[in-house]
Amino acid sequence: MTQEFIDKVSSYLTPDVDIAPISQGAEAIVFTTTTHPYLPRAKDSHQKYIIKYRPPKRYRHPQIDQALTKHRTLNESRLLAKLYLIPGLCVPQLIACDPYNGFIWLEFLGEDLPGGHGFSNLKNFLWMHDQDPYSDLVATTLRKVGRQIGLLHWNDYCHGDLTSSNIVLVRDGARWTPHLIDFGLGSVSNLVEDKGVDLYVLERAILSTHSKHAEKYNAWIMEGFEEVYREQGAKGAKKLKEVTKRFEEVRLRGRKRSMLG
């Protein structure tokens, strides 16, 4: 990402808004800022926010590109606003949305992990605990991750890109609270296929980065997930059976694709 591009983004926001890039994906670029879109900046404030920006795609017709950017930015913003209201579900708070220019302003979550282990997403957290992978802290955190996914799915929402990098951990004393982030591919869906795919994507992400301990890690995640459904009584047990059955089918299809190359 060039300084010229950053300056161009800054010109959309006005020079008063400081930005620092932290990640770049296929659809969006994520910046941090210390500037709130509406509130005056407090002196000596260390408060940070996230700005997610969908840049124009030159390969698309400008009118089509503008329409897609507006639709996707609004869709993600509306989804986050609804998810934030679900009791027990942890997602970043939506602060502002500019769909015409492709900007979303969000609450900043997480921190740097001790010992130079990077930002506090689930992937880095598990790497940090690689010397003690089966500790109570790791098990508890992964079950909490499963509960977050369970709450998301029980309320008929799907993430669409559920990797260990899209789960941010927020410190709560000696413990950590998982938050689901980046709902650019999120959707409202009661389809067991979509839920099964979500679970499979996370399972594969854990397997690819923490292969030695992946079986136990994924089992703990599923314990938390299943707990949410079982708390809903007979209806929850029935739906859980449907989701886990489809998850197994999705997993089987994935294995067949791997074997065939």
From Swiss-Prot:
Pfam families: Kdo. It catalyses: L-seryl-[protein] + ATP = O-phospho-L-seryl-[protein] + ADP + H(+); L-threonyl-[protein] + ATP = O-phospho-L-threonyl-[protein] + ADP + H(+). Its main location: cytoplasm. PROSITE patterns: PROTEIN_KINASE_DOM (PS50011), PROTEIN_KINASE_TYR (PS00109). This is EKC/KEOPS complex subunit BUD32. It is found in: Cytoplasm; Nucleus; Chromosome, Telomere. The modification Phosphoserine is found at residues 187, 189. Component of the EKC/KEOPS complex composed of at least BUD32, CGI121, GON7, KAE1 and PCC1; the whole complex dimerizes. Component of the EKC/KEOPS complex that is required for the formation of a threonylcarbamoyl group on adenosine at position 37 (t(6)A37) in tRNAs that read codons beginning with adenine. The complex is probably involved in the transfer of the threonylcarbamoyl moiety of threonylcarbamoyl-AMP (TC-AMP) to the N6 group of A37. BUD32 has ATPase activity in the context of the EKC/KEOPS complex and likely plays a supporting role to the catalytic subunit KAE1. The EKC/KEOPS complex also promotes both telomere uncapping and telomere elongation.
